[in-house]
């Protein structure tokens, strides 16, 4: 089972649909309705932290999940979820000089990694 922690963003259900194409069982839980202990009891194979409003420290159980389970369970963060992962591991989260929400731009992959196998560079991302 993949656990999708919903940070109160409608895109969480887009993620649910996309992940549902490759995963049989997905459980969606809001970030303020579950504890780390309950997550452990669910025994997820992986955890996805959804986008959402605000800052990582406002994302309910997410930072505690990363701190306590990140070394045991694979975690993918999208937007706010990604910011939460970065902040837990020491990054400083700041506002971008130019708002890019919903806009796309080209990126270049600068390091070889199996993570990027088969991905063309440069590529357009949002």
Where are these regions (language model features)?
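Cysteine-nucleophile active-site neighborhood
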Residues: 44-113, 118
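Active-site oxyanion/phosphate-handling segment shared across diverse enzymes
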Residues: 119-126
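Generic structural signal for residues in well-ordered beta-strands
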Residues: 26-28, 93, 125
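N-terminal beta1-alpha1 cap of cysteine-dependent amidohydrolase-like domains
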Residues: 1-71, 80
């Amino acid at each position: 089972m993949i656990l999708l922690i919903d940070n109160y963003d409608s895109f969480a259900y887009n993620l649910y649909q996309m992940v549902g194409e490759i995963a049989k069982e997905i459980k969606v839980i809001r970030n303020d309705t579950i504890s780390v202990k309950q997550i452990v009891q669910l025994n997820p194979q992986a955890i996805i932290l959804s986008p959402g409003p605000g800052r990582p420290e406002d994302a309910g159980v997410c930072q505690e999940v990363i701190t306590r389970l990140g070394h045991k369970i694979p975690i993918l963060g999208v937007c706010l979820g990604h910011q939460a992962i970065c902040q837990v591991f020491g990054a400083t989260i700041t506002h971008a000089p130019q708002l890019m929400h919903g806009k796309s731009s080209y990126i270049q992959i600068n390091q070889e990694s199996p993570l990027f196998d088969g991905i063309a560079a440069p590529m357009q991302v949002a």
